[in-house]
Amino acid sequence: MTKPLAQLSSDVIAGWYEGCAFSEDWSSHNFPLCAQLLRPLHTMPVKILEIGSWEGLSALFFLNYLPSCQITCVDTFAGSGEHVSDPDILAALPGLEKRFDANTKRFQSRIEKIKARSHVALIDLGLARRRFDLVYVDGGHEVRDAYGDAVLSWSLLTRKGFVIFDDYEWDKGTGVKVAVDAFCWNFINECIVVHRGYQLIVRKV
């Protein structure tokens, strides 16, 4: 059984990613906070929805730390307009989906990949009456995209479930913060903010 992150050595954590290939690491600095939040769910059959999976770094954290979880990963694997100005990211795009597939291959029985724009996937999941205990939102950073992801995923969240909004305090733009603040205001009677920092985490009441 996987131990809570606080009890894991750096070697064990590194072992989770042995043989994987990543062009970027935008997530690992958030793992201690996520582990603290998820500790009560550690052995439960949690259903997770991830919006924006890139190469699978954060998905692998959830799959390793929550050994009974199932995760649905939504991504176009084509990048977005915000990546146009970064030559390193542009260079990584052609092999993005192949790296995701290779990195997550050993978890095929616990992972569902949906290759689509997030709003399309979220509407389809809603029509299928899918529900999730945890939603991790790391999709588009424009206000419209981030707000749409928040609202559409909220309807898929179980009562007392969590939403983790990544990049809330991103220093390259305020779109996520504006969108998430608007979401929290509009859904003020339905959610409780449990953490506010680089990520903002809310729980459904």
Regions found by a protein language model. Give the residues of each.
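A short alpha-helical cap/connector motif
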Residues: 1-205
